[in-house]
Regions:
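Exposed, interaction-prone regions of secreted/extracellular proteins
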Residues: 8-325
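C-terminal segment of classical bacterial N-terminal signal peptides
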Residues: 2-6
Length: 325
């Protein structure tokens, strides 16, 4: 039988791989973001709100962290605002200063309406292939290869991932990250942003040419809409993998075959030298675990607010998404 512990505060600093705002070049520091905030795939968050979840642990529906031994620890609430990649302030409840949802915003609306994304979306996705599903999903799985390192190694951070996202908004994603400070790649699993908290798994290394598999799937029996999910990120080449087990906190009806996200990119040669990445074997399943044979992928490119204009393009088939940069 599990035992519930007392509330705990975040006592361990977020992983050192995650860049602090204080360490960003001046031109990449959004105005108003505190110096101690951490850069994540979802924007900038207070260190106390960026939390690690270990192997065999699980985030429960009420935000409790269930440890591998069954002990449950009630996590401290995140009371600090966070910021999108371009500095839009977001309350822990996901609302902006105008009282409107921020991260759901125009991207979700565009998928639903099958229309272009308006300018100035408040997230860091530069390119994404996705669609809005009227049926609750049960799984998305995709494969991709780690691209060559950039020829211009600076302090850029670049993320690639498939994902499932809700209107809550919560996003579950297996992530490949490149970090210019170390000129290296890593893999991890993420869940954001219920009540302003970002959860991340252990990190495992990757290198150019490695084959990667990302798998986000419900753990309930097929045929029921499920709130219990695993996010598995595997380096098929090395045989290593990480898992984040979590509650979904909403219906994950925004499906993404692949996305590109970037921070502190000053020139096009700071992207991987291949110029593109292809997500292959992309398969979407509904809550009955019936495969969606022809997902209606929408190709969304939001580079309108970027000073740097590279070769941003998207190509999709029923089972692939190629992102050009």
């Amino acid at each position: 039988m599990s035992t519930t512990g007392t509330a705990f505060a975040q006592t361990q600093a977020p992983d050192a791989r995650l860049t602090r705002v204080a360490n960003l070049a001046g031109q990449h520091k959004p105005a108003g973001v505190p110096q101690d905030y951490v850069q994540t795939p979802f924007g900038y968050f207070a260190p106390a709100c960026v939390r690690h979840i270990g192997a065999s642990e699980r985030i429960l529906a009420d935000g409790t962290l269930q440890k591998a031994n069954g002990i449950q620890e009630q996590s401290a609430r995140c009371s600090q605002d966070n910021f999108t990649s371009n500095g839009v302030r977001v309350r822990p409840n996901g609302l902006g200063l105008d009282g409107q949802e921020v991260r759901r915003g125009a991207s979700s609306a565009a998928f639903k309406k099958r229309s272009p994304v308006p300018a100035a979306i408040d997230h860091a996705y530069i390119s994404s292939a996705g669609y809005y599903s009227g049926v609750s999903p049960g799984r998305i799985v995709a494969n991709w290869k780690v691209p060559p390192n950039p020829t211009n190694v600076a302090r850029q951070t670049i993320y690639f991932f498939p994902a499932l996202q809700s209107d809550t908004p919560v996003i579950l994603q297996p992530v490949l990250g490149y970090r210019g400070e170390s000129n290296s790649w890593d893999l991890s699993s993420w869940n954001c942003c219920k009540e302003g908290v970002v959860w991340y798994s252990d990190f495992i290394p990757a290198k150019s040419g490695d084959q990667i598999n990302g798998d986000v799937y419900a753990t309930c029996a097929a045929g029921s809409v499920c709130s219990s999910w695993n996010i598995d990120t595997r380096n098929v080449t090395s045989g290593r993998s990480v898992r984040l087990s979590t509650t979904s906190y909403g219906d994950l009806t925004q499906i993404m075959a692949g996305a590109l996200e970037g921070y502190s990119v000053d020139s096009c040669d700071e992207y991987p030298a291949s110029g593109n990445i292809t997500f292959t074997g992309v398969a979407v399943y509904d809550y009955r675990m019936k495969q969606v044979r022809s997902p209606p992928w929408e190709e969304i490119i939001d580079n309108s607010g970027l000073d740097l204009q590279c070769n941003y393009q998207l190509d999709t088939t029923s089972t692939t998404a190629t992102i050009h940069y």
